[in-house]
Each structure stands twice: as structure tokens, then as C-alpha cells.
């Protein structure tokens, strides 16, 4: 193994409008082809739509949506003696956030509303109320881990 030092995690600068690191990370997840300004417009428009529909703080709704989508366990493939087992493993906090954001964006992209901002707003509202495609994805992952609990002793 190389004897180089371990590279530390980069610090994410907070977004310019709300000064939130979580929102800055979410903007980076939505961004495609390096078009950050477009991603920012989509997120800020979605947050405005959420603010119109709900009287609560829109950042708290985003936080609630991500809380309801974050997985606590997932399954990883592990090969033992010629057969592959789906082994349930606990998810690290950084990965929980990353998976929640990714699933929320994927679910929003599959929705039928006219613009991406409306799709994202709809999915955030659904997820904050514990329904929607992203929450269903989390439930499926948890169900898969529960079904394979017998292989938990293969954890590494």
C-alpha cells in the first residue's frame, strides 16, 4: 500500500442565498454538466413553491423530507464460498445524506409535473409527509435488509 497521507474531506461552502451547507450539497447533487447556476435556480424556485404551499420554513421542510428518506441500513453483496449473500450493513451518516439527496432527486426526475422545480417541490412535500417515491425507495431498502437479517453475521 502507498504510504501517502489520507486526503481529508473537502469543506463545502454554504449556498449564497440561505447560507446552508446542506442546501449547497443538494445543489451539487442536482447539478448536471457543471451548470451550477441552473441547479441553483431550480432549487430556489422549488423552495419558493414549497413556501407558497406550506406556511412552515422551507428549509425545515427540506430537512424533514431528507430525514424521512435517509436509510439507516442497506444491503451489500458479499461473496462467501461460491455464493453471493446480500448482507445488511449500517449506513454511515455522510452516506445517509448522500443517498437521501440522490433518491429525492431521482424520484423528482421521474415525476410528471411541467418543470423540474415543480417536480422537486412536489417530491419534497411528499417526502416531508412520509409518502412519495423517495420514501418508498427507503422502505424497499429497509425491507431488503430485514429480509436478509439472517446473513448479518457475514458483516465485515
UniProtKB/Swiss-Prot annotation:
Keywords: Ribonucleoprotein, Ribosomal protein, RNA-binding, rRNA-binding, tRNA-binding. InterPro entries: Ribosomal_uS7 (IPR000235), Ribosomal_uS7_bac/org-type (IPR005717), Ribosomal_uS7_CS (IPR020606), Ribosomal_uS7_dom (IPR023798), Ribosomal_uS7_dom_sf (IPR036823). It comes from the Bacteria. One of its GO terms (biological process) is translation. GO terms for cellular component: small ribosomal subunit. GO terms for molecular function: rRNA binding; structural constituent of ribosome; tRNA binding. Pfam families: Ribosomal_S7. One of the primary rRNA binding proteins, it binds directly to 16S rRNA where it nucleates assembly of the head domain of the 30S subunit. Is located at the subunit interface close to the decoding center, probably blocks exit of the E-site tRNA. Part of the 30S ribosomal subunit. Contacts proteins S9 and S11. PANTHER family: RIBOSOMAL PROTEIN S7. NCBIfam families: rpsG_bact. Belongs to the universal ribosomal protein uS7 family. This is Small ribosomal subunit protein uS7. It comes from Shewanella frigidimarina (strain NCIMB 400). The gene is rpsG.
Amino acid at each position: 500500500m502507498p504510504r501517502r497521507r489520507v486526503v481529508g474531506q473537502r469543506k463545502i461552502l454554504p449556498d449564497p442565498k440561505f447560507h446552508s451547507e446542506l442546501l449547497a450539497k443538494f445543489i451539487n447533487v442536482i447539478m448536471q454538466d457543471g451548470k451550477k447556476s441552473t441547479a441553483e435556480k431550480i432549487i430556489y424556485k422549488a423552495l419558493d413553491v414549497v413556501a407558497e404551499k406550506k406556511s412552515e420554513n422551507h428549509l425545515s421542510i427540506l430537512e424533514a423530507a431528507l430525514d424521512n428518506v435517509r436509510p439507516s441500513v442497506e444491503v451489500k453483496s458479499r461473496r462467501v464460498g461460491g455464493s453471493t449473500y446480500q448482507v445488511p450493513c449500517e449506513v454511515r451518516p455522510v452516506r445517509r445524506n448522500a443517498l437521501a439527496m440522490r433518491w429525492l432527486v431521482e424520484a423528482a426526475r421521474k415525476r410528471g409535473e411541467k418543470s423540474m422545480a415543480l417536480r422537486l417541490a412536489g417530491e419534497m412535500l411528499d417526502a416531508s409527509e412520509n409518502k412519495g417515491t423517495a420514501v418508498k425507495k427507503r422502505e424497499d431498502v429497509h425491507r431488503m435488509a430485514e429480509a436478509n437479517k439472517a446473513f448479518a453475521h457475514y458483516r465485515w
